[in-house]
Amino acid sequence: MAELENPSVMSKLIAFLSSLLERVAESNDLTRRVATQSQRVSVFHGLSRPTITIQSYLERIFKYANCSPSCFVVAYVYLDRFTHRQPSLPINSFNVHRLLITSVMVAAKFLDDLYYNNAYYAKVGGISTKEMNFLELDFLFGLGFELNVTPNTFNAYFSYLQKEMTLLQPLSLVVVPSSRSLITFNDDEASHQKQQQQQLAV
């Protein structure tokens, strides 16, 4: 998509995705503390919160992964699918970094003709190659190997991101109660307008 080739659009996209994921993680951290049902711990769950911010981490991935800009939109689609298929593994501050590096790597492997191997992504993400391999496998099974993103789905997610970035331009941020998911679209996009109103707006 031509707009994604624009560096200013990509820097805004990175900033917005970081902000969104940070709010989702913080919201789920609070929910986790008061939740009566236990949340499953997975390979994505770190023992402690990483010291690097989500935005710095995503900028690092963008700088070193050298994947196509579309990978970041597709990674977002994958994260959304993952959270819907794995409701007991909501995005939080203990797993968001690992989910990010894994979703971008899987998106690059699926979309791009040329991409780096797992060892390279492990270095970029600050984890071991063995851990990167486990994360990839768990992520793929968590997605049910549903990696294809139709043009309609891609455009719907990208349009949503564009709209939200435009709304945040004046950066008057309003926080509203959130649900667990990021955004919900069906591949057929038949109920796109209705679903857009039900998206996460943290």
Swiss-Prot record:
Gene3D superfamilies referenced in this protein's UniProt entry, alphabetically: Cyclin-like
Gene name linked to the record: CYCU4-1
Keyword field contains Calcium: no
The organism of origin for this protein: Arabidopsis thaliana (Mouse-ear cress)
PANTHER family in the record: CYCLIN-U4-1, PTHR15615
Family: Belongs to the cyclin family. Cyclin U/P subfamily.
Entry keyword set: Cell cycle, Cell division, Cyclin
Subunit structure: Interacts with CDKA-1.
Protein name: Cyclin-U4-1
